[in-house]
Amino acid sequence: MEWMRSRVGTLGLWVRLLLAVFLLGVYQAYPIPDSSPLLQFGGQVRQRYLYTDDDQDTEAHLEIREDGTVVGAAHRSPESLLELKALKPGVIQILGVKASRFLCQQPDGALYGSPHFDPEACSFRELLLEDGYNVYQSEAHGLPLRLPQKDSPNQDATSWGPVRFLPMPGLLHEPQDQAGFLPPEPPDVGSSDPLSMVEPLQGRSPSYAS
């Protein structure tokens, strides 16, 4: 009788062990959701145009040029396409795609584009507003991101108020139409030769030619 209890106990231990192994395998079969706060925008890198109409001479897009100057452009351009990358929760870096320069800010508030990333000068806090606009502020200096103004270039930066920017989606590589290339036509399902394997290829895309 004692032998029977011992055997039953051993069998129960093996059943529990096998059940634990099975449940562990099922758990590992499912991907663990990434709860990193750096992915709050669906990805660490966003491609955007930063547009502002706050307290500027004209409506403008933030533009980083290859010589390192930062200006406001009335229209979108390759120089105004930016990459916004999360560094930590609420803090980002801004890179001009064409110029390959990081947006940075001096202690006096002046903006410039640097070929090298300086965590102190090139890190910005990003505050999301309810109206869809964002406010950016230097993490090190606490000064708001603001495009240079022609009428008051020497204005005291400490008197600047927050400027709203509207992040407008942009593509790193805009699709371009290829001249002289026609997309392939769908097969004619009503034909006895829907894939044109027998009939001569007349007026079809060159991609169908052998």
Curated annotation (Swiss-Prot):
GO cellular component: cytosol; extracellular space
Localization per Swiss-Prot or TrEMBL: Secreted
S-S bonds: none
Superkingdom assignment: Eukaryota
Gene3D superfamilies per UniProt: 2.80.10.50
Induction cue: In the liver, down-regulated in postprandial conditions. Up-regulated at the transcriptional level by CREB3L3.
Keywords of this entry: Growth factor, Secreted, Signal
Listed InterPro entries: FGF15/19/21, Fibroblast_GF_fam, IL1/FGF
Main location: secreted
Tissue and organ distribution: Most abundantly expressed in the liver, also expressed in the thymus at lower levels. Expressed in skeletal muscle (at protein level). Secreted in plasma (at protein level).
Keyword flag Secreted: yes
GO MF, one example: fibroblast growth factor receptor binding
Subunit organization: Interacts (via C-terminus) with KLB; this interaction is direct. Interacts with FGFR4.
Name under which the protein is recorded: Fibroblast growth factor 21
